[in-house]
Amino acid sequence: MSDQTPQFGQTPSEAEPDAVALEAGRKLFAGECTFFHGTQRLDQLPPPMGVEIAFAGRSNVGKSTLVNALTGRKTLARASSQPGRTKQLNFFNLADQLVLVDMPGYGYAQAAKDVKEDWQGLMFSYLRGRPNLRRVMLLVDARVEFKASDIAVMELLDKAAVTFQLVVTKADAVKPTPLQRRVADVYAAARAHPAAHPHVFVTSSDTGSGIAELRAALAGLTD
């Protein structure tokens, strides 16, 4: 990446999909999307049924909210203001073309230790062993610097050779100059991890910024 980090609402050339790609993303995510499975146990995972995209991140980073924004549905994935509430893998079938996986949040210190270890163990085991997992979208809050748990997850994904892509959420909550610094830090993290995709998405589920581009990129993974 060059020294010029994209401002909020701007993206480098690889993230500027053409009209065909944008329309493909719009059509895919306008299709029927239904919840079909939730589990806290590896032995109860659904059989692989096509390309899976997992959404991971710290508790309360906005995973469920982003899934809802992508699909244009307010209540498809249950979002909670209470960090650590989502404790299972939730699977959504998008138009029989893509499976979206809303993962439990990690790094919430106030969760009971045994419960925290149980759901983080499930998450890590899923990431390492799911054969049809095409990409992990690793969400980071625009307002919060990287935590040790974020670094640990990126290192685990490197070790497991699971491709992940960083997505900045809640970008509308940060003023342009600090947002630019934050995005620069996230790009630096992407460069430092071999399993990371080089492009970072900067999004706001509230304003919709970056959502169309992310839809287009995810639709491209179904090819």
Curated annotation (Swiss-Prot):
Q: Which residues form the EngB-type G domain?
A: 49-223
Source taxon at top rank = Bacteria
Report the HAMAP family cross-referenced here.
GTPase_EngB
User: Which organism is this entry from?
Assistant: Granulibacter bethesdensis (strain ATCC BAA-1260 / CGDNIH1)
GO BP terms: namely: division septum assembly
Q: Which UniProt keywords apply?
A: Cell cycle, Cell division, GTP-binding, Magnesium, Metal-binding, Nucleotide-binding, Septation
Q: Which Pfam families match?
A: MMR_HSR1 (PF01926)
Q: What does this protein do?
A: Necessary for normal cell division and for the maintenance of normal septation.
Protein's name in the database = Probable GTP-binding protein EngB
Identify one Gene Ontology CC term for this UniProt entry.
Answer: cytosol
Q: Which family does it belong to?
A: Belongs to the TRAFAC class TrmE-Era-EngA-EngB-Septin-like GTPase superfamily. EngB GTPase family.
The UniProt record gives the binding positions of GTP as 57-64, 84-88, 102-105, 169-172, 203-205
Checking PROSITE patterns in the record gives:
G_ENGB (PS51706)
Q: Which InterPro entries match?
A: G_ENGB_dom, GTP-bd, GTP-bd_ribosome_bio_YsxC, P-loop_NTPase
Instruction: Give the cofactors, semicolon-separated.
Output: Mg(2+)
Which residues make up the binding site for Mg(2+)? S64, T86
Give TM segment ranges. none
Q: Which NCBIfam families match?
A: GTPase_YsxC
Any one GO MF term held by the record is: GTP binding
